[in-house]
């Protein structure tokens, strides 16, 4: 096992215009303060205020959006980071681990990773992801990419259909089709901060949001040693070279994770479990009394000093005492949140320290709060009650189905841009309006300038005389559409769908 030295991980250099020379502790902290400013002031963060947490298109400001959720995760992440550093200081290990002059950057990287963790999520959350992937699967049929004979391939895009005698190109076709059918919010977050927004964050800060290490084009079995780290796509083919450079800069082995990402993940797990239940009460899906009984029933028999007793029952009893002039709901969730944090944060911090050799190496194949402990059971309890009584509620399911239809409908509306030939689309990009393509011209001009420029830049770097050019061009054209639609807020996507379907009231 390599020696633990966080100076080799907290890399303050950037991809472009990187600071040069040796830096003092204060100068390094200023570099990460610059990251904070870039992130907090980015439009992608502002858009989170109109993206779904659980309840799409919610008008009640007391119910969480992606932004308010991310701010809560940021605070919990800061709490865990401080707890870790405090315990390492007590153990006199800060200097031994190269952290004595990097405590500020350590905390800042965790906080900003937490704030950004949902930055790539599409409108309507996981149902938006599913809509994008299903729509592309119905046209690209990635499962046919291994088909024999090749005539069985049902891909509707000629450039990406497998052909006899073109095995090197066929392998690229397989990768592209697989990649495009595995849109994922975390992978889109990497693409957003590097390719689309050009935020030029430090290597360490980007490493903090590389939650999953599996490429989106992966087709084989995941290694048992990395099955958790690779359970979802973490980056796209379009960012392959950037991620390879990131791994080099952060001393990460293939498919390994940046150490501070485990803290961000734990903060998210702690935050959303309680928040989803609180939002459900705010939405009148159930009362606090009903929630308590759901939790009690799901946990089962327990001893007086059990974690359930110390966290949930304690919150319930204190909220019923009415010692404060606040509603039972407010008191219950205040105590539930405080009790949960006071138990889970120290536990997550100690798990991080206990497993630091594997975490530092990037190979710890678990979440900090997924084990055989009571703390893990408590999180599972919150999640299971939410799944059974919140996510399956008819109002929630109806909104999710509407969201799925909106995203599918928008992709269908913009489909003509994907149906144009390479030469015709190139002409449209150059001229912006082509008389013989009135519909396509209007659709193209509705795309955001940022996304169009990202497409142009990517295609301009391709060798136009290469037999791979038509494949890559189509890939980036699909990315253009995915970038545009996934970047919409819930409300904008809803309104845009109604406008373009001519159903606006």
From Swiss-Prot:
Keywords (alphabetical) are: Hydrolase, Magnesium
Q: Name one GO molecular function term.
A: dGTPase activity
* Stored InterPro entries: dGTP_triP_hydro_central_sf (IPR023293), dGTPase (IPR006261), dGTPase-like (IPR050135), dNTPase_1 (IPR020779), HD/PDEase_dom (IPR003607), HD_domain (IPR006674)
- Per UniProt, residues of the HD domain are 66-273
| Classification via PROSITE patterns | HD (PS51831)
- Top class in the EC scheme: hydrolase
Cofactor(s) this protein cannot do without? Mg(2+)
Query: Sorted alphabetically, which Gene3D superfamilies does this protein's record hold?
Result: Hypothetical protein af1432 (1.10.3210.10), putative deoxyguanosinetriphosphate triphosphohydrolase like domain (1.10.3410.10)
Which reactions does this protein catalyse?
A: dGTP + H2O = 2'-deoxyguanosine + triphosphate + H(+)
Q: Name one Pfam family in it.
A: HD
E.C. number(s) listed in UniProt = 3.1.5.1
Listed under GO biological process in this entry are: dGTP catabolic process
The family assignment reads: Belongs to the dGTPase family. Type 1 subfamily.
HAMAP family noted in UniProt: dGTPase_type1 (MF_00030)
Summarize subunit and interaction data from the UniProt record for this chain: Homotetramer.
* Primary role: dGTPase preferentially hydrolyzes dGTP over the other canonical NTPs.
Record protein name field? Deoxyguanosinetriphosphate triphosphohydrolase
């Amino acid at each position: 096992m390599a020696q633990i030295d966080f100076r080799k991980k907290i890399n303050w250099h950037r991809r472009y215009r990187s600071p040069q020379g040796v830096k003092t502790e204060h100068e390094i902290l200023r570099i990460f303060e610059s990251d904070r400013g870039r992130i907090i002031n980015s439009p992608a963060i502002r858009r989170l205020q109109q993206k779904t947490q659980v309840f799409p298109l919610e008008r009640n400001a007391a119910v969480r959006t992606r932004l308010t959720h991310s701010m809560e995760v940021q605070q919990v992440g800061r709490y865990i980071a401080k707890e870790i550093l405090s315990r390492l200081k007590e153990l006199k290990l800060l200097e031994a681990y190269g952290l004595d002059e990097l405590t500020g950057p350590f905390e800042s990287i965790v906080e900003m990773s937490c704030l950004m963790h949902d930055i790539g999520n599409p409108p309507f959350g996981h149902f938006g992801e599913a809509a994008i992937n299903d729509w592309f699967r119905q046209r690209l049929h990635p499962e046919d990419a291994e088909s024999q004979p090749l005539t069985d391939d049902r891909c509707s895009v000629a450039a990406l259909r497998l052909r006899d005698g073109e095995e090197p190109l066929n392998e690229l076709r397989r990768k592209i089709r697989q990649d495009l059918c595995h849109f994922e919010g975390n992978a889109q977050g990497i693409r957003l901060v590097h390719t689309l927004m050009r935020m030029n964050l430090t290597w360490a800060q980007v490493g903090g949001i590389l939650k999953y290490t599996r490429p989106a084009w992966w087709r084989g079995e995941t290694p048992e040693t990395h099955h958790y780290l690779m359970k979802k796509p973490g980056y796209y083919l379009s960012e392959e070279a950037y991620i390879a450079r990131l791994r080099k800069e952060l001393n990460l082995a293939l498919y390994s994770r940046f150490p501070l990402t485990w803290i961000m993940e734990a903060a998210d797990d702690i935050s959303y479990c309680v928040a989803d239940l609180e939002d459900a009460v705010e939405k009148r899906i159930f009362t606090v009394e009903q929630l308590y009984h759901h939790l009690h029933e799901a946990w089962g028999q327990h001893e007086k000093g059990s974690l359930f007793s110390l966290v949930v029952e304690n919150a319930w009893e204190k909220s019923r005492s009415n010692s404060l002039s606040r509603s039972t709901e407010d008191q219950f969730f205040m105590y539930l949140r405080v009790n949960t944090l006071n138990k889970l944060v120290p536990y997550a911090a100690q798990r991080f320290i206990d497993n630091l050799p594997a975490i530092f190496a990037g190979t710890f194949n678990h979440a900090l709060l997924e084990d055989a402990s009571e703390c893990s059971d408590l999180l599972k309890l919150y999640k299971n009650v939410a799944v059974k009584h919140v996510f399956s509620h008819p109002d929630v399911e109806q909104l999710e189905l509407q969201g799925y239809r909106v995203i599918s409908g928008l992709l269908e509306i913009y489909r003509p841009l994907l149906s144009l030939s390479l030469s015709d689309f190139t002409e449209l990009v150059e001229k912006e309006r082509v008389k013989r393509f009135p519909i396509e011209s209007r659709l193209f001009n509705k795309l955001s300038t940022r996304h169009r420029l990202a497409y142009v830049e990517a295609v301009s770097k391709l060798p136009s005389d290469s037999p791979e050019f038509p494949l890559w061009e189509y890939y980036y054209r699909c990315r253009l559409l995915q970038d545009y639609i996934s970047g919409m807020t819930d409300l904008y996507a809803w309104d845009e769908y109604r406008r373009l379907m001519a159903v606006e009231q």
